[in-house]
Amino acid sequence: PENAQVGNYKLSTDFYISQIMSFIDGLELIKPVVMGCSIGGRIILHLAINFPDKFRALIGLQSAGHLDPYYDISWLHRQDVHGGEVCGGIAYGLMAPTSPESDKFETMWHYMQGGPGIFKGDLFFYKFDGNIGNEIKKIDNSKCPIYLLTGEYDYSATPEETKSLADTIGIEMIKMKNVGHFPMSENPKEFLKYLHPVLNKII
């Protein structure tokens, strides 16, 4: 994004939405299915509110309407802290102990590769700008089907928070066993057991 090089990158809701909609328009996609995890699980809620007629379905992984503060994100971009290692450590702690170590390490490695301050900037959306609050009540599942799947091992977007979100929308949530915050990458084989039935409903 413009000005990211000077260290003030902050992912906003409007920018995030614009990137997704520009991608869809650029490829001339007609009512695609969008799936997002973590911050992606949050943005699908905004898409459901603002563009329900544009999607065939929306799938949220580890979705929650807001995030209760649990650590100081300033640690993610400081001169006296190795940003890659601390970002990787945070990601690792969000994964289930039952997920394969090789897949967990690969997921952690992705987070260790981010540019300075990028993860911190992404979390600006996740922790602050993207919080939905009472706007959740505007989501109409009859206009666009929404599916919420959350791993049982996640202190960021907990199953309880996703359940509360699902109850507000008036849908069922799917609780996934043996996975954490990154189901598709930390334990893909286990995740597909839950995803395939959802995709079969959509198609």
Where are these regions (language model features)?
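Conserved catalytic-core motifs of eukaryotic protein kinase domains, centered on the activation segment
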Residues: 2-8, 69-72, 159-160
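Conserved loop-alpha-helix segment in the C-terminal half of the alpha/beta-hydrolase fold
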Residues: 141, 145-179, 185
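Flexible "cap/lid" loop of the alpha/beta hydrolase fold
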Residues: 45-50, 55-86
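Active-site loop/oxyanion-hole signature of alpha/beta-hydrolase fold enzymes
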Residues: 1-35, 193
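Post-His helix in hydrolase/transferase enzymes
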Residues: 185-199
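Glycine-rich phosphate-binding loop signature in dinucleotide/nucleotide-binding domains
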Residues: 24-30, 141-142, 198, 202
